[in-house]
Amino acid sequence: MLSGGKKNNADVTDTVKDQVYKSKDELKKQWGNNYENNLKKIEEAVSKTAGQVLTYDGKPISASFFSTSNGRTENAADYWGNDYPYLKSVDSPWDQASPKFTSEQTFTVADFQKRLGVKVLADGKVGNIKDLTEGKRVKDVAFQGKTLTGKEVREKLDLRSSDFTWKQQGDKIIVTTKGFGHGVGMSQYGANGMAAEGKKYTDIVAHYYKGVEIKTMNDYEGKLMVKK
């Protein structure tokens, strides 16, 4: 939603593009013997925070989140082009313990060129990473006569993150990424790491969403309207 796009005229989808939804049967299959315990934790968290809203400057925020950072979160403006004062780059060192912290993907040179619409030089120079964002992700990559943003490269190659490096080996290009997701807002593995250190949920949201306040729905009684 923060990117401003729609899918099949819907504002929200049940995929990683917005928010994954899984039925209880799917969760039972995924969690196995841990299903009851995990579900209890979720229900308890929902119950204890019922009616609470994250706000900035008196208005509910767009609380974006993702799986795993590269050690820092990303500025919303650097990834989506839309600036949100509470979605700023912050340290997130706990993510290094995530099984999704690093990964590799291999492409043929032909597939790589086709997906990006570029040419790879014969000397093995795949492309020149020109700039990094504050969140240490790729901002721009220069190819022969063409420049792509890190976000564009990530989406065209279906990479886990826009923090990437690459090398050519023969007719293959190996891409190494750090992190998993767009990187904006709260890292789920980072939040879990903070919780494991004894931090409260109020500490966690204050770290990832700068300058926010927690309000209750009672504060907005009579102020919220359903959009028809």
Language model segments and positions:
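C-terminal soluble interaction/assembly domains
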Residues: 144-228
